[in-house]
């Protein structure tokens, strides 16, 4: 009896500002823990990871997944390309004399497929090593003027006293075959093409690494007299000022031809990857 009173009294004692709470009962140890229903913890064999005797969860096959997705989306999947093939483009390569336009063109011809290099018609005499129909179509002055009269040329110009022009038919035929077109023209021809084609063509300006390097190349060609060299160098200085009218500039440094050609290829790849493609009509 006394023990009960003491217990009751101890539960109600409150020290000043410090109440003491004595629990009425203490947690009891878990009884019969070993007797918990094994069936409530046991996983079936088919759900035990790593169990060699478990059956793999059956997943739908790829065709079944596709059919299910199509049904839920309400439309069928198509194997057609997400985007159409890129348009054919016209690449205009130009630059002053002595920058290596022909070297870049010839190397590009070796390493890049899907390009047609337009052969320009000219009234000038053939130089040593040149091949008619490959380097130029060599025609007489009268023949050239006849082509002009019949509107067979996309553009033409009088350069250093000789005519040069681009045949239309050649471009149309190869674009119809799906090939991109490369035009190698002088600065005057590039200006004319810019007026005709506007922004539908890609204009690349080739330059040497320095003016001195450009002049040395002209001298090394040994195709002009001193007076002719003077005219070409003076003209080249003027032509460099037209760089701002081009889309891209590529430096063709001595001994770095591959680098220049790689740059031109990168430009072509970038143009073919544009969301808004250029459209050429000739």
UniProtKB/Swiss-Prot annotation:
Q: Composition bias, kind Polar residues: at what positions?
A: 51-62
Question: Which keywords annotate this record?
Answer: ATP-binding, Chloroplast, Kinase, Nucleotide-binding, Plastid, Transferase, Transit peptide
What's a GO biological-process term for it? regulation of developmental growth
Listed under GO cellular component are: chloroplast
Q: What else is known?
A: Plants silencing GK3 have dwarf phenotype and develop albino cotyledons and leaves.
Q: What class of enzyme is it?
A: transferase
Q: Which reaction does it catalyse?
A: GMP + ATP = GDP + ADP
Name the domain of life this protein comes from: Eukaryota
Main localisation, per the record? Answer: plastid
Self-association and partners: Monomer.
Spell out the protein name for this chain.
Answer: Guanylate kinase 3, chloroplastic
Q: Where is this region: Disordered?
A: 43-63
- Cystines in this chain: none
Q: Name one GO molecular function term.
A: guanylate kinase activity
TM segment ranges: none
What positions does the domain Guanylate kinase-like occupy? 88-269
Positions binding ATP in this chain are 95-102, 252
Name its cellular compartments.
Answer: Plastid, Chloroplast
**What's the stated role of this polypeptide?**
Essential for recycling GMP and indirectly, cGMP.
């Amino acid at each position: 009896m006394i023990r009960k009173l003491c217990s009751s009294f101890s539960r109600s004692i409150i020290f000043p500002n410090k109440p003491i709470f004595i629990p009425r009962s203490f947690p009891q140890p878990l009884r019969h823990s070993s007797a918990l229903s094994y069936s409530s913890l046991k996983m079936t064999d088919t759900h035990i990871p790593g169990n060699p005797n478990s059956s793999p969860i059956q997943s739908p096959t790829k065709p079944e997944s596709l059919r299910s997705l199509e049904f839920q989306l309400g439309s069928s999947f198509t194997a057609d390309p997400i985007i159409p093939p890129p348009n054919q483009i016209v690449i205009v390569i130009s630059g002053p004399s002595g920058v290596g336009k022909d070297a870049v063109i010839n190397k590009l011809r070796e390493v890049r497929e899907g390009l047609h290099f337009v052969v320009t018609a000219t009234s000038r005499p053939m130089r040593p090593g040149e091949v008619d129909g490959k380097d130029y179509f060599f025609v007489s002055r009268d023949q050239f003027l006849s082509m002009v009269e019949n509107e067979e040329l996309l553009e033409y110009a009088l350069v250093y006293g000789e005519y040069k022009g681009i045949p239309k038919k050649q471009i149309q035929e190869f674009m119809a075959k799906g090939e991109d077109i490369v035009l190698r023209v002088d600065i005057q021809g590039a200006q004319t093409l810019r007026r005709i084609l506007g922004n539908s063509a890609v204009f690349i300006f080739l330059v040497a690494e320095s003016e001195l390097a450009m002049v040395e190349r002209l001298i090394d060609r040994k195709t002009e007299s001193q007076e002719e060299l003077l005219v070409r160098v003076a003209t080249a200085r003027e032509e460099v000022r037209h760089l701002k009218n081009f889309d891209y500039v590529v430096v063709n440094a001595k001994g770095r031809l591959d680098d220049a050609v790689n740059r031109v290829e990168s430009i072509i790849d970038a143009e073919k990857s544009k969301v808004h493609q250029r459209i050429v009509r000739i």
